[in-house]
């Protein structure tokens, strides 16, 4: 293969990666402003590409959301590892993990709904993301259960759904600044077998 031919073959891949990265940047801004139900065609227009280019990279909204959340996974993983490293009390560790999960689930307005629906849709790229979060929640939960700090019948999947419900309620029209701590307390008293003081944030 000649150098000229090689350069021609590399250029489309480079351009495609550049387009993909640019679309993700624009989509993050658009969803931050309009929520996850924002128009994909509007994202394409704002990115200066045709709808076909966007859909070649991201065939549907779930694929686009999964790509955006993938970019945030490093932060969530870092918080998980810090909790494991710094917190000795398994019940407090679970509490802090649920708080980190709640912050992740509120990255964009309306995000809890597609996350809630994803596990039931086996083909959704968000399903794998959710399963990873549930698996980690189970690990923290089981440690708290062994320590007597969480009720034995509670499941990680239920806590994950509870976090999504609280995250959704935070954005409800009737919610105010007192809603997040009140809702977190309600979730906490649902799983805790003894009183747990809210973690210092």
Outline where the language-model segments fall.
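Hydrophobic/aromatic residues within well-ordered alpha-helical segments
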Residues: 19, 72, 76, 90, ...
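Alpha-helical DNA-contacting segments of helix-turn-helix folds
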Residues: 58, 65-72
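C-terminal peripheral helix-coil segments that are non-catalytic and often amphipathic
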Residues: 1-7, 135, 139-150, 165, ...
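Hydrophobic alpha-helical connector segments
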Residues: 67, 78-107, 122
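Short hydrophobic/aromatic patch on the recognition helix
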Residues: 48-58
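All-alpha amphipathic helical-bundle segments outside canonical DNA-binding/catalytic cores
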Residues: 125-129, 146-161, 175-178
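Short secondary-structure transition hinges
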Residues: 96-136, 168-172
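Basic, helix-initiating cap at the start of DNA-binding domains
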Residues: 1-45, 63-66
